[in-house]
């Protein structure tokens, strides 16, 4: 059996299967590998609004402390109460423009002023309207206490930095003798909102409130391309259980599991390029919960018991609300493990050092496009010894083609004898039939890892290279790079030995066309990497063939 041909056929076949699967997902059909009917339904369903979105106060211990199930507790269905109305307070800093609704003290809208959409408008992360629902909520449970349905009163004060380092919004709500004061502090240059919660028992009987912090979001994806998709949904982190993603589908089916109670960690909502997270005060015990609270509305949250408050007593606790881009180094400084919301897929072990090196190159070159090119050159240098050995093996295989063809013709009716003769030929000539495939196989994990680096890195978003490439995170608008890539792949196939099998030869000629069509929909940064990689491979192969030719000439001259 021609093992090399088999491996190439497998790689080509899998490429076609993945191509077809991406087309299926792009057209709204279930993936053959990752079916998710819940997300398809969520994408077409309107976001929850009114009482369904506003009156869904969580119940105490909605999630067991053991974390074995995430099914909603009995009685946790949305309440049909009328939605309260409140004042919309707009806070503006150099990084965000946030809207806080005094009806519940909810952060109901948040714009990222340094991140822009294609139309030039700021990216809107939090939003609550008839199309989208995504907001940060907090309140007290353990009785009829102030929660995210209570109308709060806002203290007067500045709502913009205006040269200051920070701006505060103080909200006060009272219900049944319990007063809750929320203090949101927005700081210059930060995507973190410091949140303080002061609870006072102004009644005549002891109370035992529990603070909840949650992120509520509809199940629709944003910025989903035809040919790639990243994780969208809740995530939970603790020091013991590490990073744990929870799909909307599993939550809807009651199959999602959450970590046990801890005195560390955080909860988050993740989407392509951006994330939000509630980070409670470290050292205080809290439990986690996830829940589907409407056909197209989900939440992930934390419940922190505040203990028993005697009449007149006050207890305070702090938390931080992050809402911003997935910039790895910034996330590392905010909370342990928060950088994991940047989804590198299953090759994180390779992707993280690749991004580290790419970032170092960017610090020197100042342009992400040139940094990708420089990284590609470095990767080729690392793989050069292996590639040189491989091309030498391919050169030997090319010299053996006439003898291999003769063996195939001689034993075409006896496959077993043909394989024996082939193996004998390989042993005699000291040729490894897999030698030519090795660089391809070795580079596939690196290619996939770099794919996830370029796909997941918000730094590529809006980053220009030169000329017509104004954004490395979106496809080439004029398809110039995919066409150049197709030409380079065609040249590569011409430099390789012609396969003896006519069908295989045709497949190798068609592959450049297939891959170029697929790369029409890939981010320009990724295609740039592949184009440069192909051009360097062509130059490398030409040089090695030249060296091999000189070596053969020297041998002939000596003989």
UniProtKB/Swiss-Prot annotation:
Gene this protein is translated from: yidC
Keyword check for Transmembrane helix: yes
Function, as annotated: Required for the insertion and/or proper folding and/or complex formation of integral membrane proteins into the membrane. Involved in integration of membrane proteins that insert both dependently and independently of the Sec translocase complex, as well as at least some lipoproteins. Aids folding of multispanning membrane proteins.
Record-level GO cellular component terms: plasma membrane
Domain of life per record: Bacteria
Transmembrane regions listed in the UniProt entry: 7-24, 338-358, 364-384, 434-454, 472-492, 507-527
Organism name: Cupriavidus taiwanensis (strain DSM 17343 / BCRC 17206 / CCUG 44338 / CIP 107171 / LMG 19424 / R1) (Ralstonia taiwanensis (strain LMG 19424))
Oligomer and partners: Interacts with the Sec translocase complex via SecD. Specifically interacts with transmembrane segments of nascent integral membrane proteins during membrane integration.
Keyword Transmembrane helix attached: yes
The family this protein is said to belong to: Belongs to the OXA1/ALB3/YidC family. Type 1 subfamily.
Segments for region (Disordered): 45-82
Subcellular location: Cell inner membrane
Annotated InterPro entries: Membr_insert_YidC, Membr_insert_YidC_N, YidC/ALB3/OXA1/COX18, YidC/Oxa/ALB_C, YidC_ALB_C, YidC_periplasmic_sf
Pfam families: 60KD_IMP, YidC_periplas
Main localization of the protein described in the UniProt heading: membrane
Compositionally biased tracts (Low complexity): 45-55, 63-82
GO molecular function: membrane insertase activity
Topology with respect to the bilayer: Multi-pass membrane protein
GO biological process, one term: protein transport
Keywords, comma-separated and alphabetical: Cell inner membrane, Cell membrane, Chaperone, Membrane, Protein transport, Transmembrane, Transmembrane helix, Transport
Protein name listed in UniProt: Membrane protein insertase YidC
């Amino acid at each position: 059996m021609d093992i090399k041909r088999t491996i190439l056929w497998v790689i080509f076949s899998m490429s076609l299967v993945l191509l077809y699967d991406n087309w299926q997902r792009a057209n709204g059909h279930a993936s053959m590998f990752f079916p998710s009917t819940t997300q398809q339904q969520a994408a077409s369903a309107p976001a929850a609004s009114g009482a369904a979105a506003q009156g869904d106060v969580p119940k105490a211990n909605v999630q067991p402390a053991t974390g074995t199930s995430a099914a909603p507790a009995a009685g946790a269905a949305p309440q049909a109460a009328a939605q309260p109305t409140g004042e919309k307070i707009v806070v503006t800093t150099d990084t965000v423009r946030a809207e806080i609704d005094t009806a519940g003290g909810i952060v109901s809208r948040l714009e990222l002023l340094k991140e822009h959409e294609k139309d030039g408008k700021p990216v809107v992360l939090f939003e609550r309207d008839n199309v989208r629902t995504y907001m940060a909520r907090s309140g007290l449970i353990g009785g009829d206490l102030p929660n995210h349905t209570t109308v709060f009163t806002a203290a007067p004060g500045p709502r913009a930095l205006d040269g200051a380092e920070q701006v505060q919004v103080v909200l006060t709500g009272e219900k049944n003798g319990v007063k809750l004061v929320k203090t949101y502090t927005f700081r210059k240059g930060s995507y973190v909102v410091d949140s303080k919660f002061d609870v006072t028992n102004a009644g005549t009987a002891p109370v035992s409130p529990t603070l909840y912090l949650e992120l509520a979001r509809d199940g629709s994806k944003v910025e989903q391309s035809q040919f790639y998709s990243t994780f969208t949904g809740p995530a939970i982190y603790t020091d013991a259980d590490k990073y744990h993603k929870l799909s909307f589908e599993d939550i809807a089916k009651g199959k999602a599991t959450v970590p046990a109670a801890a005195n560390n960690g955080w909860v988050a909502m993740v989407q392509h390029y951006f994330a939000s997270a509630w980070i409670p005060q470290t050292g205080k015990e809290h439990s986690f919960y996830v829940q589907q609270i409407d056909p197209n509305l989900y939440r992930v949250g934390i419940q922190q018991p505040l203990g028993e408050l005697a009449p007149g007593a006050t207890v305070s606790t702090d938390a931080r609300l992050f809402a911003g881009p997935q910039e790895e180094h910034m996330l590392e400084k905010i909370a342990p493990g928060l950088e994991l919301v940047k989804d590198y897929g299953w090759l994180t072990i390779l992707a993280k050092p690749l991004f580290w090196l790419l970032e170092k190159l960017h610090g020197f070159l100042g342009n992400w496009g040139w940094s990708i090119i420089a990284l590609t050159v470095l990767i080729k240098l690392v793989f050069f010894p292996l590639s040189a050995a491989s091309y030498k093996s391919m050169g030997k295989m090319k010299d053996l083609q006439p003898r291999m063809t003769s063996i195939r013709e001689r034993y075409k009716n006896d496959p077993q004898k043909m394989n024996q003769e082939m193996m004998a030929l390989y042993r005699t000539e000291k040729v490894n039939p897999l030698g030519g495939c090795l660089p391809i196989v070795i580079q596939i994990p690196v290619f996939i890892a770099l794919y996830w680096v370029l796909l997941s890195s918000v730094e590529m978003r809006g980053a220009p290279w030169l000329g017509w490439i104004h954004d490395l995170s979106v496809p080439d608008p004029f398809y110039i790079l995919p066409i150049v890539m197709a030409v380079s792949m065609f040249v590569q196939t011409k430099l390789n030995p012609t396969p003896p099998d006519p069908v295989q030869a045709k497949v190798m000629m068609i592959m450049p066309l297939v891959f170029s069509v697929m790369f029409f929909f890939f981010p320009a940064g990724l295609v740039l990497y592949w184009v440069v990689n192909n051009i360097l491979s062509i130059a490398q192969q030409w040089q090695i063939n030249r060296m091999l030719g000189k070596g053969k000439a020297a041998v002939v001259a000596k003989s």
